Structures are given as structure tokens and as C-alpha cells.
């Protein structure tokens, strides 16, 4: 994630972030504790499409939630212990990732990474449950994958992120 900070004289500080998936978010932190969060159009980073304002307490609570400190569902704890080392992960295929335009079979996810592709949510939100080995992965597809941590991390690093290219 790219992060750029700048001072806003008389107002506070501005933080701009561009995520791995090329989403742009700006946060303005006012001297009085208010925070304004802006989300920009994915095709035009100058066009704000949504915004929200938080007071200081709301911003701190949101930070704890995003950081995973505020809430962990009890059911999730039970599932984690029942499944032991099995992890289910949602991962978006980044622009420039080696997996783009490859089939699941081409990637050899089962043999090479010991991972199963449970589903794919296409960029247009079309859902493919239990996709076949002939299913092609496109930029922006979200893969729901399961396996053990090492194989999952390796697959994500080597095939689903632009760094793997």
C-alpha cells in the first residue's frame, strides 16, 4: 500500500492511500479530532464517490475494528479450533499478477500449493462456486481459497499479487 501524508495548515493532516488493488482513500484528520474519509472512483482517482465523517471517539472505535482488536466472533474461535490448521482466505487477483488469464489448472494450485479454490467472485459480482480447473482467473477476481497457512501464503505471494510477476 502506498501512503502519502501532508500537512493542511490550519486544518490538520491529510493521508492518502492507494491499496494493492488500486483503490484510493483519503483521510483528513482535523485539529479538533474529526476525521473525514473519502473513497475515490477506481477509474478516476480525482472523483470522490463516497465520504463519511467520524468524531474522535468514532474514529478510534473504527480503528480498533479495522485492526481486529475490537471483535472476534465466538463462532470463529470454535471454527478455528475445529479446523485446526485449515484456513479459508479471500484474495483478489491483482493487476499484473501471474495468475491473470491463467486457468486454475494451469496454476496447479492443488499439487503445487495444497490449496483448493472454493469459489470465485468475478469483478462483475458473478459468483462461481466450486470452479473447474478450466476456469480462467481475471484481474479483479476474488478467489475464496482454503488450505494450510504456508501454501496459502505462497500461492497469494507467487501468483495472486503483482509482486509475483
Swiss-Prot record:
InterPro entries assigned: AAE_transporter, K(+)/H(+)_antiporter_KhtT, RCK_C, RCK_C_sf
Gene3D superfamilies: Regulator of K+ conductance, C-terminal domain (3.30.70.1450)
One GO molecular-function entry: monoatomic cation transmembrane transporter activity
Gene Ontology cellular component list: plasma membrane
GO BP terms: potassium ion transport
RCK C-terminal domain sequence ranges: 76-161
UniProt cross-references to PANTHER family, sorted A to Z: K(+)_H(+) ANTIPORTER SUBUNIT KHTT
Protein name as it appears in the record: Uncharacterized protein YrvC
Source organism: Bacillus subtilis (strain 168)
Amino acid at each position: 500500500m502506498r501512503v502519502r501524508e501532508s500537512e493542511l495548515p490550519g486544518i490538520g493532516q491529510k493521508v492518502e492511500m492507494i491499496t494493492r488493488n488500486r483503490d484510493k482513500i483519503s483521510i483528513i484528520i482535523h485539529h479538533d479530532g474529526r476525521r473525514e474519509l473519502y473513497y475515490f472512483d477506481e477509474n478516476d482517482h480525482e472523483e470522490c464517490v463516497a465520504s463519511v465523517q467520524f468524531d474522535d471517539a468514532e474514529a478510534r472505535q473504527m480503528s480498533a475494528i479495522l485492526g481486529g482488536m475490537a471483535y472476534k466472533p465466538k463462532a470463529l474461535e470454535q471454527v478455528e479450533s475445529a479446523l485446526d490448521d485449515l484456513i479459508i482466505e479471500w484474495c483478489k487477483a491483482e493487476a499484473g499478477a501471474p495468475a491473470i488469464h491463467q486457468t486454475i489448472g494451469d496454476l496447479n494450485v492443488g499439487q503445487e500449493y495444497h490449496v483448493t479454490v472454493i469459489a470465485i467472485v468475478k469483478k462483475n459480482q458473478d459468483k462461481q462456486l466450486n470452479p473447474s480447473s478450466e476456469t480462467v482467473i481475471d484481474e479483479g477476481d476474488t478467489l475464496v481459497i482454503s488450505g494450510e497457512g504456508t501454501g496459502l501464503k505462497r500461492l497469494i505471494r507467487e501468483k495472486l499479487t503483482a509482486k509475483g510477476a
